[in-house]
Curated annotation (Swiss-Prot):
Belongs to the universal ribosomal protein uL30 family. SUPFAM superfamilies: Ribosomal protein L30p/L7e. NCBIfam families: rpmD_bact (TIGR01308). One of its GO terms (molecular function) is structural constituent of ribosome. It comes from Exiguobacterium sibiricum (strain DSM 17290 / CCUG 55495 / CIP 109462 / JCM 13490 / 255-15). This is Large ribosomal subunit protein uL30. Part of the 50S ribosomal subunit. The keyword Ribonucleoprotein applies.
Amino acid sequence: MAKLAVTLTRSMIGRPENQRVTTRTLGLRKMHQTVVVPDNAAMRGMINHVSHLLTVKEIQE
């Protein structure tokens, strides 16, 4: 099963609360922090919601 490496590349300062909550739910707390998440519909939906703040790479295992 594929996984996604998600990196927070834009600051959370001045962002709406719903975007802050989404990034925290993805496990991202600091800029340039990278987390590995499973590639499923729920994660893809969260990533699409804040895609302008993230960099996403697919990881094959």
